[in-house]
Amino acid sequence: MDLGPSARASEYLSRVTTFMDDNVYPAEPTYAEQRRTLTEQGTPHHLPPVVEELKEVARSQGLWNLFLPESTDPAHGLTVADYAHIAEVTGRSIEIAPEAMNCSAPDTGNMEVLHMFGTDAQRAQWLEPLLDGRIRSSFAMTEPDVASSDATNIATRIERDGDDYVINGRKWWTTGALDPRCAILILMGKTDPGAETHRQQSMVLVPMDTPGVTVQRSLPVFGYHDQHGHGEITFDGARVPASNLIGEEGAGFAIAQARLGPGRIHHCMRMIGLAERALDMMIDRSRERVAFGKPLSDQGVVRESIALSRIEIDQARLLTMKAAALIDSVGTKAARTEIAAIKVVAPRVACDVIDRAIQVHGGAGVSDDTPLAAMYAGARSLRLADGPDEVHLRDIARQELRRR
């Protein structure tokens, strides 16, 4: 199995790497300063202006919507495996690069849903402005009052009333909902509680300005507020046209599974890129600091941290690339075990590598003088987002037991 980038992907990868070196990394201090200013002004979820500038550069260089698959854009589209290499590079500056190239979650997954399952009218109204970067979106699935790791527990109701659907319920960890550019939610709820377990749920498009939709609060992660915000949202008699249904009634669970396959590749490769950045920082710090008469890089315990990090990152990358190649060759359903495995492995590796980098940095590692603490918060949250480790381990074990 060849896990390297194709000729087309190699060309894009070179251009993305140059874009990162020439534009993204130099913009990081400006981004941090602008975020601080926006927070002090009471608008923490507004986009720092420097990112808009980077978006224009990326678009002008043809580095826009690179996540789109070959089936969508045969002239420019990449396979899942090819885009995975690019996702890793963008993960090295995870707060800036994906947004600058219009490849941010949850927009990428939402765009894929609209492309695969949306009507022509839905695509014209929502997919086109998302592809153009004029709006942002969110995905409302997790709920505070039930164990959402079991998606069949979802309690939010979507009830048909004439030509409309009426929505009642509460969602949280709705990523992107605080961004003022967020115009649309894809919401998963129950349309038929009496149906077969995996046919009870449906997905509908809910504009953010719909009466009855209220963002109650922004949820921080370990005290850090995501730039786009994680929202808790209530739906109190929110009414949308029946034409906002995605696919058919009862298809919500199947659509969710289709959405999460490639998205998990993107998440995991970005985590690997983030881990590589943390390893770079660990090595740089170990060479600069002297303790007990010699650089930290000459201390055996620090060398062990560096070596373990190198091993674990490479293992995670190979496993993720195998999963990506399987999605391309046999489809998401057949790659289910490998997709579950990477969702466990990649965030854990990122957490472990970042934690070692924090340790080598000492007190600076847990301060805001380095990005490591924020990096750790983001990586740790991914062990819960899109399903906690335990659910994926359960699925892997189930598949193994069936094979024996």
Which role does the model predict for each range below?
Residues N110-F117, A140, G194:
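Flexible, glycine-rich active-site loops centered on histidine and acidic residues
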Residues N153, P211-R239:
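Flexible, small-/acidic-enriched active-site or ligand-binding loops
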Residues D163-D164, N168-V215:
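A short core secondary-structure module
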Residues M1-E95, C103-A105, F117-Q122, P129-R134, ...:
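Alpha-helical interface subdomain recognition
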Residues A147, W172-D179, Y224, P262-H266, ...:
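Glycine-rich phosphate/pyrophosphate-binding beta-alpha loops
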Residues G237-I255:
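Long, acidic (Asp/Glu-rich), low-complexity accessory segments flanking structured domains
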Residues G133-T142, L187:
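A short, Trp-centered hydrophobic/proline-enriched beta-strand micro-motif
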Residues V146-D150, Y165:
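Hydrophobic, small-residue-rich alpha-helical packing segments that form membrane-like cores
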